[in-house]
Amino acid sequence: MCMTDPIADMLTRIRNAQAAEKKEVKIPSSKLKKAILKILKDEGYIESYQEIVSDGKLSVDICLKYFNGGPVISSLTRISKPGLRRYSSRNNLPKVMHGLGIAIVSTSKGVMTERSARAGGVGGELLCIVA
């Protein structure tokens, strides 16, 4: 199966699993996905994740986080897509919900939140917004 946007697929799997109130979700592994998951874990949006090998293929098992019976992530939106890439300079990085959410940015210094990119003085490709 040819997948044109693996990041959007990962975000959709997380959204669907939370809508179905699943405890965990399994996705194919990649370095970029693991970098995004590390940010989600550090910011408190997911419980944990771990890389596993099943049938000779690497995948990531994500433990989702809930609070008061509802998912912690209320919105998970892909911004830059393969057909239309979205880039932002350090001065134009978005503030999500006035600082209550995060934007994940792929920069020359790695994948980071928009706050880290602004503090580091770098811009980059806006991957997704989490609130």
UniProtKB/Swiss-Prot annotation:
GO molecular function, one term: structural constituent of ribosome
Top-rank taxon: Bacteria
Pfam families membership: Ribosomal_S8 (PF00410)
InterPro entries xrefs: Ribosomal_uS8 (IPR000630), Ribosomal_uS8_CS (IPR047863), Ribosomal_uS8_sf (IPR035987)
Cellular component annotations (GO), alphabetically ordered: ribonucleoprotein complex; ribosome
Biological processes per GO annotation: translation
Keywords from the named record: Ribonucleoprotein, Ribosomal protein, RNA-binding, rRNA-binding
Subunit structure: Part of the 30S ribosomal subunit. Contacts proteins S5 and S12.
Similarity-based family: Belongs to the universal ribosomal protein uS8 family.
Function: One of the primary rRNA binding proteins, it binds directly to 16S rRNA central domain where it helps coordinate assembly of the platform of the 30S subunit.
Protein name: Small ribosomal subunit protein uS8
Provenance organism: Nitrosomonas eutropha (strain DSM 101675 / C91 / Nm57)
